[in-house]
Design a protein with these regions (language model features):
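The serine-hydrolase catalytic nucleophile loop
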Residues: 102-116
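Hydrolase active-site cap/lid region
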Residues: 181-219
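An N-terminal hydrophobic leader/cap segment in hydrolases
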Residues: 4, 15-73
């Protein structure tokens, strides 16, 4: 009897260790994909120029005239958070804050920046979310805490572009989910519109989908 109990206890402990180890691996795989993000950061401009050739002359023009600029703020934990921004070709109060998706960065949203800046004549600000691009951080936060950073970037954009803007916040994928989370907070009068492009309904649903598609595991 004692031998059976020992076997059961050892089996339960072993199973618990496997589950714990697997869970930690999945969390690291999902929220700290360092190699993937380093590769994407290093190749962002060339990737975007390959996918969207019209971006190169536009970005070259912005850089040549000093119109494409960087700015940094400190996050709630003291981390440096980075963004790029550019004024519209002609003075305007119309302003877009553009939020990227999972493992992407500000540069990889320049096709949307082009739409707002070049085609629609808006000021633009594109932040690197926590742990993405040139921003610091410990892990991807899937939008929930990022909403507070985006709210701060909205204030920064309003200050940069004159203090009395008319603002749209546009997000894609995880950035779209972040945008919807932002929309649930109290807003300043200058915020006029939110654009949600392909956001997820919940982090749980998103992780369940990825577990099934990438690993064939039930969730």
């Amino acid at each position: 009897m004692k031998r059976i109990v020992r076997i059961v206890v050892v089996s339960v402990l072993l199973l618990a260790a496997i589950v714990a180890g697997g869970s930690l691996y999945m969390l690291s795989y999902s929220l700290r994909p360092d190699a993937t993000m380093r590769a994407k950061n290093a190749s962002s401009y060339e990737y975007m120029y390959g996918e969207y050739p019209f971006l190169r002359p536009w970005v070259d023009s912005l850089e040549r005239t000093g119109a494409l600029r960087d700015t940094v703020i400190l996050g709630s934990e003291g981390e440096r958070l980075h963004a790029i921004y550019a004024a519209a070709p002609e003075p305007t109060d119309r302003t877009a804050v553009i939020v990227h998706g999972y493992t992407d960065n500000a540069v990889r949203m320049l096709m949307i920046g082009y739409l707002y800046n070049r085609d629609l004549g808006c000021n633009i600000l594109l932040p690197d979310l926590y742990y993405h691009g040139q921003s610091e951080g410990r892990a991807i936060r899937m939008g929930w805490k990022d909403r507070f950073d985006v709210l701060r970037w909205m204030e920064i954009a309003n200050d940069i572009f004159g203090g009395d803007t008319r603002m749209v916040v546009h997000g894609i994928s995880m950035g779209a989910a972040t945008t919807m989370m932002v929309s649930g907070e109290e807003q300043q009068p200058y915020v006029k519109c939110f654009v949600e492009d392909c956001g997820y309904t919940s982090v749980r649903d998103q992780f369940s989908k990825e577990l099934k598609e990438q690993f064939g595991l039930p969730a």
